[in-house]
């Protein structure tokens, strides 16, 4: 068995490709079921966010393993291998373990140290738990990863500064507008990212916010917290002209705001400028909106420069975090390798127990026949010693006879002969 990590992320692929490789939450269960039908896949976790899509797998080794997994990914998303081959990365065993730990700790994020990714990894893990798609080694890996991420947060300052995609979106708005307090803001969606955006804006005294969401209940809870108005998604067209700033992050597979909708809004606004920030993957706002005069459209990739400006203070903490990940990765791999000896140890113990039971039975029979106890004990000790050292003695003789000094030393080490 082997552990694998396969995926694409913001470093290897543009949003135009990433949005084609995302797994919808509504169909994730079917995706996992389909993945587990692949001959070599024994267990799997699918992590799909706006910045990355990754498969973490426990697999049986085979010559065509990589091609098999890539073919499945392409077939599922109706892509050709040529479209994704240059953007895919592939990690195995030690590298896969290290990669997952780095991802969950925020070390591989667009925003170094951002905390949201850990919750997303936990959610992906829980989904595989529900689908009974985990093996013992994969489950142990994720549980270990969660403790590593917690240790990174506790022992370093990687998460102390308020840097995130949500924060970057708000920073962009503050750079374009002198003051946000009197502006009207439309937030589309009510997930974790929009929650963070809403709280950032609320902290900057934004007084007029609208939240458009598919389900009113989730949006209402957030609206009550930040003093916003809730509107249905269907009302966006009618209310868009009221918005100076639009920030969107939903899980919709198709754009929610189109070029024509924005054109009508700009006309109603008498061409007063509108900032639109699309931090969804797949995109919520048609990219052609960026061609309109007075419409300033930014995608999640455009936020990268802003984010980089807030990174310096996290770099030192990241070095500490990397040391923790390396240490914990080595610990996990040692545990994983030890699992390979479990069956051998079990057999060895069973064999020793059988020989002990045989010697004990012979001793009890001798006592029952009236043989003196002292003689029985001496014979028991002698026979048990001979039986237990018989196999190691033969191995030592064979190693010495063949001149295999390395094997001879290994046997000496395993028998503890150099520790007395």
UniProtKB/Swiss-Prot annotation:
Its EC number is 1.2.1.70. It comes from the Bacteria. Substrate binds at residues 49-52, 109, 114-116, 120. Pathway: Porphyrin-containing compound metabolism; protoporphyrin-IX biosynthesis; 5-aminolevulinate from L-glutamyl-tRNA(Glu): step 1/2. Keywords: NADP, Oxidoreductase, Porphyrin biosynthesis. Transmembrane segments: none annotated. The active site is at residue 50. One of its GO terms (biological process) is protoporphyrinogen IX biosynthetic process from glutamate. It catalyses: (S)-4-amino-5-oxopentanoate + tRNA(Glu) + NADP(+) = L-glutamyl-tRNA(Glu) + NADPH + H(+). CDD domains: NAD_bind_Glutamyl_tRNA_reduct. NADP(+) binds at residues 189-194. One of its GO terms (molecular function) is glutamyl-tRNA reductase activity. SUPFAM superfamilies: Glutamyl tRNA-reductase catalytic, N-terminal domain, Glutamyl tRNA-reductase dimerization domain, NAD(P)-binding Rossmann-fold domains. The record marks 99 as: Important for activity. Gene3D superfamilies: Glutamyl-tRNA reductase, N-terminal domain (3.30.460.30), NAD(P)-binding Rossmann-like Domain (3.40.50.720). PANTHER family: GLUTAMYL-TRNA REDUCTASE. During catalysis, the active site Cys acts as a nucleophile attacking the alpha-carbonyl group of tRNA-bound glutamate with the formation of a thioester intermediate between enzyme and glutamate, and the concomitant release of tRNA(Glu). The thioester intermediate is finally reduced by direct hydride transfer from NADPH, to form the product GSA. Catalyzes the NADPH-dependent reduction of glutamyl-tRNA(Glu) to glutamate 1-semialdehyde (GSA). Belongs to the glutamyl-tRNA reductase family. Homodimer. Possesses an unusual extended V-shaped dimeric structure with each monomer consisting of three distinct domains arranged along a curved 'spinal' alpha-helix. The N-terminal catalytic domain specifically recognizes the glutamate moiety of the substrate. The second domain is the NADPH-binding domain, and the third C-terminal domain is responsible for dimerization. This is Glutamyl-tRNA reductase. It comes from Edwardsiella ictaluri (strain 93-146). The lineage of its organism: Bacteria, Pseudomonadati, Pseudomonadota, Gammaproteobacteria, Enterobacterales. The gene is hemA.
